[in-house]
Amino acid sequence: MIKDKVVIITGASSGIGEATARLLARRGAKVVLGARRVDHLKRIAMEIEQAGGEALYCPLDVTQQADNDAIVAQAKDKFGRLDAIFLNAGLMPNSMLSALKTDDWHQMVDVNIKGVLNGVAAVLPTFTAQKSGYVLATSSVAGLKAYPGGAVYGGTKWFLRDFMEVLRMESAMEGTNIRATTIYPAAINTELLDTISDQKTASNMRSLYDRYGISPERIARVVEFALDLPDDTLVNEFTVGPANQPW
């Protein structure tokens, strides 16, 4: 059951995060929105509440451990509990390695890898103590299939695949009942392409998304499905994308 579950969503100011927050709130979840663009969060939370839902928003830079700890604390202070976190914040400034976009490389590592580590570090004490909790994370089909221009981005998503699987395995071994699900979206129409600074790569990716891209609400429905499963059941991976996208 989703009703009354308290769910933190990172990267909640647009795209998949925003769509998920709105859908879960309609299902009766208490959603906690985190992102850097506080003005966007404020608007989304207000609209959720005007529609009869419950929402809290907190400024969140996932690269900062203190921010991650703070959003967990605020969620528990406001709603008295925490049931799940959806680690959705991410960047995709793809480029060929020869372009030497080293600032982009480091930014992807900071957000896509360290941001996940920080989020898990923030919730793990709570989930371990209560012997329940759900960690969901947005990866990418780039974490399943290599492609030119996606070396660093894909590498961060391959990391996520291994990390989330080991989190699941260790929880099962230790009896903490922490479930872990990784979602691998293909072409989803979000602001992700706006993070690409290499013009040629951006043009190629935009052509792909213009042809195949589907709504972020499709991924929100996957999160909804996962959270609606009985507590003793887990689907640990979802690969989701346009039905007509070849890869």
Give residue ranges: language-model regions:
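Residue(s) in the substrate-gating loop at a strand-loop-helix junction
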Residues: 140
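The beta1-alpha1 cofactor-binding region of Rossmann-like NAD(H)/NADP(H)-dependent oxidoreductases
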Residues: 38-39, 59-70, 102
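Substrate-binding pocket helix/loop in short-chain dehydrogenase/reductase
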Residues: 96-97, 104-107
